[in-house]
Amino acid sequence: YGKLPNHKYMINWPIEGNDYYINLIEMSPEERGKALEYAKHYTMCFVYFLQHELGYNTLGLADDEYPTEDKLPFIPYHRESRRIHGLVRFNLNHALNPYTQDEKLYRTCIAVGDYPVDHHHTRYHGYEELPNLYFHPIPSYGLPLGTLIPKDVDGLIVAEKSISVSNIINGTTRLQPVVLQIGQAAGALAALAVKNNQKIDEVSVRDVQNAILDAKGYLLPYLDVPVTDVKFASYQRIGSTGILKGEGKNVDL
């Protein structure tokens, strides 16, 4: 459903589409290879359905995107992975009501997000017994730096979908706009640790936040103040102290 330039489309349809459930972590390498082949075949069946059942017979796999024999991407898109025990654990309550929680995580944010909590459970056998977590809108939120730092491992920074978040809130923090910001913050944290000869958990969160602001990144979702505004960084810094308390919005609310 994702329309791209040059008359191309991204195939990513969760409802009776090309979602495929696999728990790769608990498989052997041989089992993983076989399971991923099944997943590829499932995607190709969906392409066939689009072409022959829905009548989109002019659509096919692009031959100028990936240098692979089957024209599919190098790796599958994983919606969820194993997660660390971080210095902090971000959950749904922190996003819904950031200023009433015991942990003042909004003071340490390094990325923002606003995608609904979205879990694709229908491909899981027995999904009927699971809670309905499909596309529930939530307020826009800030993600704290401590989710990237393992609690019991020195010298390691975690990014992508392995950060310290709850299963439910992973339905929004997993989105690429968020994980791209996580990668930026991880890079800033690593660079500052090396530059200042510090351990990862010794680096000042304010230094990381300043690096992100210098790169025109967001700490908190004050979207009514664009990055081009001369007061943008000031509002972000004041919000990170708790003096300014912004109300997160979502387009569906």
Residue ranges and their predicted role:
Residues Y1-L213:
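Flavin (FAD/FMN)-binding glycine-rich loop and adjacent Rossmann-like elements that form
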Residues N210-L253:
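N-terminal propeptides
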